[in-house]
Amino acid sequence: MQMPRRFNTYCPHCNEHQEHEVEKVRSGRQTGMKWIDRQRERNSGIGNDGKFSKVPGGDKPTKKTDLKYRCGECGKAHLREGWRAGRLEFQE
């Protein structure tokens, strides 16, 4: 799917329409200290593993877009709900 890199849209911080630049959100670093990771570590041992004994489900064929819209006027960014797209390319 083709999408323009810059376009006019509403900025919730300026409370008016401004030109925004679109960028893909990069995932942050994962940590092993999340509650689910600690629970998995606690429950691993002898006996039934409960919900961890189930086979994890597979991936969907397409992923939802994860985009950040940065305002050209105030410089603040906001997120919006994504949609399913096989491939997302930006037009200059």
UniProtKB/Swiss-Prot annotation:
Keywords: Metal-binding, Ribonucleoprotein, Ribosomal protein, RNA-binding, rRNA-binding, tRNA-binding, Zinc, Zinc-finger. Its cofactor is Zn(2+). The keyword Lyase does not apply. Residues 22-63 are annotated as: Disordered. Part of the 50S ribosomal subunit. Interacts weakly with protein L15e. Binds the E site tRNA. Binds to the 23S rRNA. Binds deacetylated tRNA in the E site; when the tRNA binds a stretch of 7 amino acids are displaced to allow binding. This is Large ribosomal subunit protein eL42. It comes from Haloarcula marismortui (strain ATCC 43049 / DSM 3752 / JCM 8966 / VKM B-1809).
